[in-house]
């Protein structure tokens, strides 16, 4: 592997489950990398917390553990959500998304759509702002007060002429979303695209994810599908709640 990423993977793969700390010389023996290259990679991997360094010895970092746990959580979430998303797609015949909250953005982790799917800007693994997407607003409405305040006091970038950029207007929408259990987006993230979303909540009403149906404004009426989207989100929430704790959304 001649790429930087490939070489970084060689270094990470050189560690075993039994390693409690590996020295530079042993890592060079295991990887076969030149000293200068290995030193640079180790420095960068420590900087991003993929490796920890204790004196002159290295071990796998906590960030790797956190990434692994996140991947496991998302796989379980997607496994539970998929049947409900497929049913929602059959009912709406429009693009169905599943998104999760990460930092101050929504990350799309699953997407179902047929040949009629809208030309939405979303993609699996892609990120979008919270304030201009139906999924983002559904998540933000149920997010901790600290995050809501952070978003409302920060800049609200305009993506289209219909993007909400006034904090007061967004705050009123978020309160209404909590009451209604559903959020809407009307050409706020992309011109010509409308969306309806509902939050997937845990037993404490904290947001686990949100599910949505998205379509072109020329044929899709979000309000007409609000009940179906809300039912899909409720079904995902209920199914997650019945799963053993080791398989649920929380470690």
What are these regions (language model features)?
Residues 98-103, 112:
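Short hydrophobic alpha-helical segments used for membrane anchoring or interfacial signaling
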